[in-house]
Amino acid sequence: MELNFWIGLLIGLVAAGITYGTGILFATIGEIFAERAGVLNVGLEGMMLMGAVTAYLVAYNTGSAWIGLLAAIGVGGLMALLHAFMTVTLRADQVVSGLALALLGSGLSAVIGAPLVEVRTAPRLPEFPIPVLSNIP
């Protein structure tokens, strides 16, 4: 009986890790490509937070999750452009610039997102079931 509990707990932890770790996995893959190009981007977390708040805000106000996604891509691109400007043009250290962007994104997303906490829901993207993977419990 006790073994079944631990197996169930392990399965639940792995399932939760896969579910909640997908966004971090995407950021990790992006950072791997950036590292291969010789860029150390420590500010990915701030960029992701700003993109998430922007996507939610735009999707809620426009009623379209696709426009929210495009806005998040634009904000992420602007923050990446700011990182490139600081490191290439101003010759700032990549770690310092990345940490500044991480702190900026974290703080600014908290300030912008505070009024959105009371908002119930925003439009969602449609589901795209993958034939083999969608049948896995």
Language model features: what each stretch is:
Residues 63-108:
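Alpha-helical transmembrane segments within multi-pass membrane transporters and channels
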Residues 106-137:
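Transmembrane helix-bundle core of multi-pass membrane transporters
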